[in-house]
């Protein structure tokens, strides 16, 4: 039985990515026509690492950055989200090993400034980290969002 891959190993495994593909008919209903870039996990992590304290980024900005970088119409919404999640857990793995300079995953939001409850420690961990950096978190129905998050978005 082979050992389970660590989050860090998952992040490093590019599986032949990035690659740019034509948007399929099934996908075009929601995303339009053109091309989609499926990024390498490391690329998503690199963008997340660029966000300084007090600043934020959303998955949508990451996708736009990837699309521009690869001259694609869009960045893949599914894999970009999955790779951000892997990056978050790899960061916590690094922290557990005593590394200080980890990927600040708590600064990467879902669209609309929403906190990602799937990140390590859930909403509570994110609230503590984000409030410590000067952000105000409000509840909108079942979601938690950062008030005026647009004002804190990083320009890449």
Predicted regions, residues:
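Nucleic acid-binding interface residues in structured DNA/RNA-binding domains
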Residues: 2-156
């Amino acid at each position: 039985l082979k050992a389970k891959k660590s989050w860090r190993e998952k992040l490093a495994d590019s599986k032949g990515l990035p690659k740019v593909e034509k948007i399929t008919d099934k996908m075009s209903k929601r995303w339009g026509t053109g091309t989609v870039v499926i990024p390498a996990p490391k690329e998503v992590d690199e963008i997340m690492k660029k966000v300084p304290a007090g600043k934020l980024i959303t998955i949508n900005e990451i996708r736009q950055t990837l699309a521009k970088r690869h001259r694609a119409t869009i960045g893949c919404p599914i894999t970009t989200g999955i790779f951000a999640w892997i990056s978050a857990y790899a960061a916590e793995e690094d922290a557990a090993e005593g590394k200080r300079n980890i990927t600040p995953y708590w600064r990467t939001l879902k669209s609309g400034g929403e906190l990602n409850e799937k990140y390590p420690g859930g909403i509570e961990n994110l609230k503590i980290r984000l409030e410590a950096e000067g952000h105000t978190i409000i509840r909108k129905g079942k979601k938690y969002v950062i008030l005026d998050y647009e004002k804190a978005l990083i320009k890449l």
